Amino acid sequence: MKWYPWLIKPYKKIIRLHERKKAHHAILIKTQKGMGVFKLVWFISKWLLCLKPKGTNFCDNCHGCKLMSANNHPDWHTIINEKNDVFDVDSIRVINEKIFKRAQQGNNKIIFLPNVHKLTESAVNALLKILEEPPEKNWFFLIDYNYLKLHSTLKSRCFLYRLPLPLEKESLNWLKNNNKKDNISNLTSLRINQDSPISAKNFIESDLWDERKNLYKSLSHSIKDKNLLKILPVLCKKNTIMKIDWICLLLFDAVKTNFNERKKLINCDQIKLINFFSKKYNNILLNKSIRKWTKCRYILSSVSSINSELLLLEQLLLWEKILCFITP
């Protein structure tokens, strides 16, 4: 596994807590997706399971390190329920069985829960009992992608570690070294993905990037012809919800431009479109457009029986009126 540069400091900080015997037995890592948190946990675990660690580094040569590198260490336990994608009481029973058995390599044991929000209420209650007073040398790593909704008692039983986003400049340097896109494209992808560098890389290398560009190209042509219905086939094809999000992000950028906040634009590769909306329409009309698109998105995502093409047609006709392409 390769390091991500923004994980080096968090790794060393947590390892040093273990070196000083100050580490909590349960670390709850608060982060967002696209940060490589699994690698962070894996490297920390490899150090904990290393038989001959060298300072903050694992030796990468002992039997424990070789087992980790082969993803076959008997004392590394990732708890995943593949049946229904949730952690229920049965999942916690598996944990309970693991922690009260002697470590097969005679040292530490690692319990990794990749997403605590998949825990059912009964599973949380069962886990709380385990975390209250677990056997020695059992180390729990829990990942949380939505801290606001997390069980308060579960938070209190863990050491909370917030994994910070890397600086934008640092992420851009990493993206530059890991793909062939230009700086403006990388910056746009990074901001679309809430500054998560790995998500930005995956997005810009996927078909979604081309779909986004095609949507804006089609929108530009339809604006020129004052006929927004031309983008209907593009919207209906696939990823409709995501495409509505892209339209809203573009409109938000126009609002920011009207407030002279150009440094915070998301769609840095669509300045021409942003300028069209910001110069042609005030924020009242832009906000009205965003609200109508948001309502359309909500209906599409919550009403399974809806005729999506008909709804989008209605939305585009309404948007034409808002933008004064047709008279009401």
Curated annotation (Swiss-Prot):
Molecular function (Gene Ontology), one example: DNA-directed DNA polymerase activity
UniProt keyword annotations, A-Z: DNA replication, DNA-directed DNA polymerase, Nucleotidyltransferase, Transferase
Recorded GO CC terms: DNA polymerase III complex
Catalytic activity, EC: 2.7.7.7
Keyword Isomerase: no
Complex and partners: DNA polymerase III contains a core (composed of alpha, epsilon and theta chains) that associates with a tau subunit. This core dimerizes to form the POLIII' complex. PolIII' associates with the gamma complex (composed of gamma, delta, delta', psi and chi chains) and with the beta chain to form the complete DNA polymerase III complex.
Alphabetical list of PANTHER family matching this protein: DNA POLYMERASE III SUBUNIT DELTA, REPLICATION FACTOR C / DNA POLYMERASE III GAMMA-TAU SUBUNIT
Name of the featured protein: DNA polymerase III subunit delta'
Function: DNA polymerase III is a complex, multichain enzyme responsible for most of the replicative synthesis in bacteria. This DNA polymerase also exhibits 3' to 5' exonuclease activity.
Keyword Methyltransferase: no
Top enzyme category: transferase
Species, as recorded: Buchnera aphidicola subsp. Schizaphis graminum (strain Sg)
Catalytic activity: DNA(n) + a 2'-deoxyribonucleoside 5'-triphosphate = DNA(n+1) + diphosphate
GO terms for biological process, alphabetical: DNA-templated DNA replication
